[in-house]
Amino acid sequence: MDDCRFETSELQASVMISTPLFTDSWSSCNTANCNGSIKIHDIAGITYVAIPAVSMIQLGNLVGLPVTGDVLFPGLSSDEPLPMVDAAILKLFLQLKIKEGLELELLGKKLVVITGHSTGGALAAFTALWLLSQSSPPSFRVFCITFGSPLLGNQSLSTSISRSRLAHNFCHVVSIHDLVPRSSNEQFWPFGTYLFCSDKGGVCLDNAGSVRLMFNILNTTATQNTEEHQRYGHYVFTLSHMFLKSRSFLGGSIPDNSYQAGVALAVEALGFSNDDTSGVLVKECIETATRIVRAPILRSAELANELASVLPARLEIQWYKDRCDASEEQLGYYDFFKRYSLKRDFKVNMSRIRLAKFWDTVIKMVETNELPFDFHLGKKWIYASQFYQLLAEPLDIANFYKNRDIKTGGHYLEGNRPKRYEVIDKWQKGVKVPEECVRSRYASTTQDTCFWAKLEQAKEWLDEARKESSDPQRRSLLREKIVPFESYANTLVTKKEVSLDVKAKNSSYSVWEANLKEFKCKMGYENEIEMVVDESDAMET
């Protein structure tokens, strides 16, 4: 880690614990525990909600969160496998009707700190997560501080919280001698920032894997004391004053390297010596945490440079589209690319392939956690992926139908759509949609990137229905498919959510529209009342 200039885990812990948030939170927890009821009060403009600890017989059994019906966390990023939480904590949260009691109490507040000790901490984390993950976020800021809280859920829950950009709202204070926060069940995973404390100071870790590693080290090296679970008041008030005092390094001379000096101070803050075996293990854990946290950030920065390097490929496709739109043949770039094999088509095809490889690599890196959990929520990548998909997917559809084996190939939307587009669709669904405005001109690119694939299916339905050999029953079934697409396409055109190439005189859509009109006239459908169509069903990809 020589390329790292500073190690800040010990400094971060010192700064955090010195703020009134932690002393006031613990005082609130203590009052709630004594009264055995939820305490809500204001201190210096901050509303504290302290949830009391509840003696429980059994913790450690996981249960899946409901994904249908009354969903507790609708705004939480969904992952596979299913996010799970401790069954006893979930049951207690529902029994105590915490969410019903808070909805009115917190109206008009600006900053709310949800806090709790032991099982009260787990309930506090659950409550804060419920507030933060609603479809409509609360009007106030939410922060959660727990003391000696048991772990709440599985790895999928931890990952979902991180990807939803909610992890920074949680801070868990844990004594290195307290057994309660360290679950023996390997299925449980931490989330948020962990502030490990001892009489010597504290260290902050915010990577789930590093927190688990620290738990394992403490299980084998730290002195285990059942009374430690009740000593958080001592730690909070002692450490908050310790920050104001000067620190002296106990391990001889301070290392010249500022990063190594920071690591050494962090090891001592947890009460370990830099020279003994336990201290070496803690040092390795802190260094690993730094490396794990930095690696995705650095890779994301490198990827931004790689994105810039493929920009010419995207511009090549844009220029190709513009040239096709202006051509005398009155065909859009979809039809040009599908029908012809000109020299300029070869060049744009190479750009299409280059972009596909780049985005396939990005998707793979996201899935293997090589990038930050919230990578896909960054504005740069939201816009870049959207622009890429709007411009390139029609060419991928054209290429598919250009080379398709009609007998065995099926359709593009029948399991042949590249995974990258399905993932980008999920990314876009997680973005707040701006209020819809009426377009005064046609879009620069068709807003439904699967429009041409749906048209190809509708073309086959119409071709089959037009055949003389088509029996009335089969023709009726085909009409039930054609009419929804017609309604959907008309809606897109009316709202001007298609590009001009869709309405070009000789485009596939214009030809299909003319053939449909002729077929209706021939069959006497023109004056019939068409069936009512669910437009949303028609527009499903």
From Swiss-Prot:
Q: What is the effect of changing M16A?
A: Loss of interaction with EDS1. Loss of interaction with EDS1
- A GO term for molecular function: transferase activity
**Xref: InterPro entries:** AB_hydrolase_fold, EDS1_EP, Fungal_lipase-type
Task: Kindly list the biological process annotations in GO that this record carries.
Answer: aerenchyma formation; cellular response to trehalose stimulus; defense response to bacterium; defense response to Gram-negative bacterium; defense response to insect; ethylene-activated signaling pathway; leaf abscission; leaf senescence
Altering S118A: what's the impact? Loss of antibiosis and deterrence against green peach aphid (GPA, M.persicae) feeding, but normal leaf senescence and plant defense against pathogens
Null mutant phenotype: Impaired camalexin accumulation, reduced synthesis of salicylic acid (SA) and ethylene (ET), and altered expression of pathogenesis-related genes (e.g. PR1, ALD1, BGL2 and PR5) upon some pathogenic infections (e.g. P.syringae) and microbe-associated molecular patterns (MAMPs) recognition. Loss of the systemic acquired resistance response. Reduced fitness characterized by lower seed yield and survival rate. Increased sensitivity to P.syringae, H.arabidopsidis, turnip crinkle virus (TCV) and E.orontii. These phenotypes are reversed by SA treatment.
Keyword Transport listed? The answer is no
Entry's EC annotation? 2.3.1.-
Can you tell me which residues form the catalytic site? S118 (nucleophile), D178 (charge relay system), H229 (charge relay system)
How this chain assembles, per its entry, is: Part of a nuclear complex made of EDS1, SG101 and PAD4 that can be redirected to the cytoplasm in the presence of an extranuclear form of EDS1. Sabilized by direct interaction with EDS1 in infected leaves. Part of a nuclear protein complex made of VICTR, PAD4 and EDS1. Interacts with VICTR. Interacts with EDS1.
Q: Extract the PANTHER family matched here.
A: LIPASE-LIKE PAD4 (PTHR47413:SF2)
Query: Function of this protein?
Result: Probable lipase required downstream of MPK4 for accumulation of the plant defense-potentiating molecule, salicylic acid, thus contributing to the plant innate immunity against invasive biotrophic pathogens and to defense mechanisms upon recognition of microbe-associated molecular patterns (MAMPs). Participates in the regulation of various molecular and physiological processes that influence fitness. Together with SG101, required for programmed cell death (PCD) triggered by NBS-LRR resistance proteins (e.g.
How is this protein named in the record?
Lipase-like PAD4
Organism source for this protein?
Arabidopsis thaliana
Traced from the root, the source organism's taxonomic lineage reads:
Eukaryota, Viridiplantae, Streptophyta, Embryophyta, Tracheophyta
Gene giving rise to this polypeptide: PAD4
